[in-house]
């Protein structure tokens, strides 16, 4: 299927009808589409590093990085470039093909742009794809990052337009769409998805996917996060989402965005191997490697490696070796990381 053949005119009731399909029918449809466009046993691996943690002025009710909530998170300033490069080297040694850098900002300050551009160009020189998530971007900031070599920019829509106001009040839905427009205009690829399990209805999950699938060009990467409830945030006591509803969201995302990478993001640590296997079958074909996603836990690398072996999956760039060979790779990566003089956060959910 070419980009021109993709649909960009999905109606809400069409997507809701997909969500309502019997599970076997939905999974068959999603997996069939997945096999048409991807190696069904290949998974793209990214590593995500928090380059500036905490003290965000926004009021996103799910986020422990907001300065408005008492979550016990220690804020950190923008970290040194050498620490970023140390983590990037370790990520590459561990098999990651993309390195993502996230900062807890409403938007980057102009004084930080030269520093951010250096980060991008230095990581890019290692032969890895680069991604950043820094909040809202102006047209000029997007162009500067693109000129530095940034491949992807992440800016999630989070949920449907109708439910959005119950989640965030300090940034509008249109603000988010404007940033994505600036990213596209600068020539970068878009990474945009959302979070499920925030008390939304099934129609809101349909609404989120409708917004993404009806963009002039589908996001190249679509992260689907399961809410990680953090003490101190307004959402710490929400009821858990039925895991099968998460699988349905993955499957429908695959159907309406056939050429996009659908990423399992935050919440994987709480998922059973069986649930993750269902998600991969439903069309998920990207994950974050590493023990932490920003301030939330992520499966240990060895756990992911073992699961890949059990399911017969392999990273995007070449098939995995034996368990012993993979352990040697991860040991080498850890040795590189240990050279860093200070600990720092690994990542944030995209």
From Swiss-Prot:
It is an enzyme of class 2 (transferase). [2Fe-2S] cluster binds at residues 100, 131, 191, 263. PROSITE patterns: RADICAL_SAM. The keyword Nucleus does not apply. It comes from the Bacteria. Belongs to the radical SAM superfamily. Biotin synthase family. This is Biotin synthase. It comes from Shewanella loihica (strain ATCC BAA-1088 / PV-4). The lineage of its organism: Bacteria, Pseudomonadati, Pseudomonadota, Gammaproteobacteria, Alteromonadales.
């Amino acid at each position: 299927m070419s980009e021109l053949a993709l649909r960009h005119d999905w109606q809400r009731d069409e997507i809701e009808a997909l969500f309502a399909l019997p599970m076997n029918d939905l999974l068959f449809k999603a997996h069939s589409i997945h096999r048409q466009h991807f190696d069904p046993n290949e998974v793209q691996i990214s590593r995500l590093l928090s380059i500036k943690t905490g003290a965000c002025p926004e009021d996103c009710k799910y986020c422990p990085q907001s300065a408005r909530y008492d979550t016990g998170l220690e804020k950190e300033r923008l970290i040194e470039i050498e620490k970023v490069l140390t983590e990037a080297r370790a990520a590459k040694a561990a098999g990651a093909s993309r390195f993502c850098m996230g900062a807890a900002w409403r938007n980057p300050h102009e004084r930080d742009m030269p520093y951010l551009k250096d980060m991008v160009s230095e990581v890019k020189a290692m032969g890895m794809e680069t991604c950043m998530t820094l909040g809202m971007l102006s047209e000029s900031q997007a162009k500067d990052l693109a000129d530095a070599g940034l491949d992807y920019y992440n800016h999630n829509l989070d949920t449907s337009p109708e439910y959005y106001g119950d989640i965030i009040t300090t940034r509008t839905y249109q603000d988010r769409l404007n940033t994505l427009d600036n990213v596209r205009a600068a020539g970068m690829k878009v990474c945009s998805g959302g979070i499920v399990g925030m008390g939304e209805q099934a129609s809101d999950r349909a609404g989120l996917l409708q917004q993404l699938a009806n963009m002039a060009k589908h996001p190249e990467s679509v992260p689907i996060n399961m809410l990680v409830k953090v003490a101190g945030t307004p959402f710490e006591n929400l009821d858990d989402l039925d895991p099968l509803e998460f699988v349905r969201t993955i499957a429908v995302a695959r159907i309406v965005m056939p050429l996009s990478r659908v990423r399992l993001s935050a919440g994987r640590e709480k998922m059973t191997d069986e649930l993750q296997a269902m998600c991969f079958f439903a069309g998920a074909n990207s994950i974050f490697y590493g023990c932490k996603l920003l301030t939330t836990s992520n499966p240990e690398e060895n756990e992911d490696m073992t699961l890949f072996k059990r399911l017969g999956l392999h990273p995007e760039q070449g098939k995995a070796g034996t368990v012993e060979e993979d352990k040697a790779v991860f040991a080498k990566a850890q040795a590189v990381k240990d050279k860093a003089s200070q600990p720092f956060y690994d990542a944030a959910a995209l």
